[in-house]
Amino acid sequence: QQQHLGVQSMATKAALGRDADYDAVINVSAFSGIVDYQPDELILTLRAGTPMHEVESTLASANQMLAFEVPDLHKILASQSAGTIGGVLATNASGPRRLTAGAARDYLLGFDAISGRGERFKSGGKVMKNVTGYDLSKLICGSYGTLAIFDEVTLKTLPKPETNISLL
């Protein structure tokens, strides 16, 4: 029997895209927490349901940041929070720094995921040059959970710049 399954954690991006009629929704909010953080190596491995405020505070404690500057759209989308890292990657959400630094998918080094058949699979690793063949990270980011459900992701981080200027 074929069913249409939706994937969500905090449902902060539910207003994006077209309306969907799901038979069931898989809530992945339990896939949460920092698995491994190596500030000296600029590598962060975490579960996909980890809230963005936790990701940002962890990185700030080591004076680091995500290069792709996650846009905080929670007020525009009428959601309670900025969401999770899995939602950011599933939508490839990237802010104004995308023009110079790149998108979220450019900093996804590797991931563990669950396919539509319920099978676990891995792609990539913990270093920048780790892909031979298809780079599934580039494909999965921005797929809105239609190709796979992220379980664990490894991201490249960057040191925070000493100065920061905003132009309004």
Where are these regions (language model features)?
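N-terminal glycine-rich flavin-associated loop
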Residues: Q1-V7, V28-S81, L89, A93-K126, ...
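Short glycine-biased active-site loop of nucleotidyltransferases that positions the nucleotide triphosphate
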Residues: A14-A20
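Short, acidic (Asp/Glu-rich) active-site segment that either coordinates a divalent metal cofactor
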Residues: L139-E162
